């Protein structure tokens, strides 16, 4: 409780400093107050000077805790922003796969999982999930093309084993 009071004082004194809002959001998140966590984290995002992939990834993570379709959809938007900035963040891909699964978009969840496994060096699993994704993913979508790319890249590696 005291840390929250101290952070609120700092925010009142320095309202445009995103770090204080982010930290207070983390405190609320650690205490399972997800509504307050997302409120303060959104304030942090609105005050950052430059685009930061981690802020968007964390917001996506916070929104997933609600386990509500509209929040999961919002999480997808934040996680996609994060991945546009840094497409090599395996944890952001993991969170995106969870968000897609929560909204019932299993083919897109499989695609995001394929990307994650590719980044962490799990080539066979990446290949398997890319193949699964391709079966139901919307043809000619960016995810469809990327799934095809992954399959083509990995086919040679997987067939050697």
Give the residues covered by each predicted segment.
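Extracytoplasmic and endomembrane cell-envelope/extracellular-matrix remodeling and assembly machinery
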Residues: 1-47, 149, 159-161
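Zymogen propeptides/activation segments of proteases
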Residues: 2, 74, 110-112, 125, ...
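Extracytoplasmic/secreted envelope proteins and their assembly/folding machinery
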Residues: 4, 8, 21, 38, ...
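Solvent-exposed, acidic/flexible segments
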Residues: 13-18, 30, 34, 72, ...
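Secondary-structure boundary/capping residues
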Residues: 19, 53, 91, 142-143
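Alpha-helical adaptor scaffolds
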Residues: 25-32, 39-103, 107, 111, ...
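Terminal, low-structured helical/coil segments at or just beyond the last alpha-helical repeat
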Residues: 117-161
């Amino acid at each position: 409780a005291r840390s929250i009071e101290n952070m609120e004082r700092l925010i009142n004194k320095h309202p445009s400093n995103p770090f204080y809002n982010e930290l207070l959001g983390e405190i609320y998140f650690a205490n399972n107050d997800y509504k307050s966590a997302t409120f303060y984290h959104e304030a942090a995002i609105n005050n950052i000077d430059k685009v930061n992939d981690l802020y968007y990834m964390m917001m996506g993570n916070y929104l997933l805790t609600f386990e509500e379709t509209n929040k999961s959809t919002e999480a997808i938007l934040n996680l996609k922003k994060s991945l546009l900035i840094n497409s090599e963040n395996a944890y952001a891909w993991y969170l995106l796969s969870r968000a897609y699964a929560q909204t019932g978009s299993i083919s897109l969840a499989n695609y995001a999982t394929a990307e994650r496994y590719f980044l962490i060096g799990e080539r066979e699993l990446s290949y398997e999930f890319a193949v699964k994704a391709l079966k139901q993913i919307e043809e000619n979508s960016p995810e469809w093309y990327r799934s095809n790319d992954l399959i083509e890249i990995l086919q040679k590696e997987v067939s050697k084993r």
